[in-house]
């Protein structure tokens, strides 16, 4: 397993095992961790996690579990048995669901992955929340869900970098994982609440999820190295 000290998590957002491994083979596991999301995991199942771990990568399993407490807790346990470094669940599943996941991991005999809560997806703005019956600013909803996550004993949160300062102030013990990271000059794509890597760390983020600026670069290894150098 790598001794990765970098905050960078590269999103392996690909439909096939071959495409994901083609990128992973260009990356140094000492400079980044990798994220396996719904598309890749559904296509490849648990074998992709085993293969990536065999290449030295710590794996963030980004499946955003959301179900009744026992079902979600058993899914988190299955992720731990795969040897993932980090796993996440939706905070909107509620206090009992998150607490059940934490309790299950506390009883797990092997290395325990970080248990991270998903607050408000970075693609969602106020009008999107209104469409699902929440007449509230995204940042206020994030703070409400963060309080639940803290009470449940979660290790951290997925949040946008704009929300990081308020979250660090309110819950300094929670580790913050931030998607929607774009180096200066990159396209925003479908994520709205974005900052550059340096801005995100300065705002209080602990881990940075970066996808297309690395995966679609002409030279992914060079793109990763440039971001690492920017962060010092």
Curated annotation (Swiss-Prot):
A Pfam family per the record: OMPdecase
One GO location term (cellular component): cytosol
EC number in record: 4.1.1.23
Active-site feature positions: 64
UniProt record similarity statement: Belongs to the OMP decarboxylase family. Type 1 subfamily.
Task of the protein: Catalyzes the decarboxylation of orotidine 5'-monophosphate (OMP) to uridine 5'-monophosphate (UMP).
The name this protein goes by in its record: Orotidine 5'-phosphate decarboxylase
Organism the protein comes from: Pseudomonas aeruginosa (strain ATCC 15692 / DSM 22644 / CIP 104116 / JCM 14847 / LMG 12228 / 1C / PRS 101 / PAO1)
């Amino acid at each position: 397993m790598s001794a990765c000290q970098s905050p960078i998590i590269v999103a392996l957002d690909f439909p096939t095992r071959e495409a994901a491994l083609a990128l992973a083979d260009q990356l140094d596991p000492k400079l980044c961790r990798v994220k396996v999301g719904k598309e890749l995991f559904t296509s490849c199942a648990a074998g992709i996690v085993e293969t990536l771990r065999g290449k030295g990568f710590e794996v963030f399993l980004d499946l955003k579990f959301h179900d009744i407490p026992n079902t979600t807790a058993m899914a988190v346990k299955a992720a731990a048995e795969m040897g993932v470094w980090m796993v996440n669940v939706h905070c909107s599943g509620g206090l009992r669901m998150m607490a059940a996941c934490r309790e299950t991991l506390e009883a797990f005999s092997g290395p325990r992955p970080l248990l991270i809560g998903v607050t408000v997806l970075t693609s969602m703005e106020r009008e999107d929340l209104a469409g699902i019956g929440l007449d509230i600013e995204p940042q206020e909803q994030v703070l409400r869900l963060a309080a639940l996550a803290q009470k449940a004993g979660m290790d951290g949160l997925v949040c946008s970098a704009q929300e990081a300062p308020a979250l660090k102030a309110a819950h300094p013990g929670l580790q913050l994982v931030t998607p929607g990271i774009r180096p200066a000059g990159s396209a925003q794509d479908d994520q709205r609440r974005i900052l550059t890597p340096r801005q995100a760390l300065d705002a209080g983020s602990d881990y940075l999820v970066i996808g297309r600026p690395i995966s679609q670069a002409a030279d992914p290894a060079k793109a990763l190295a440039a971001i690492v150098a920017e962060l010092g």
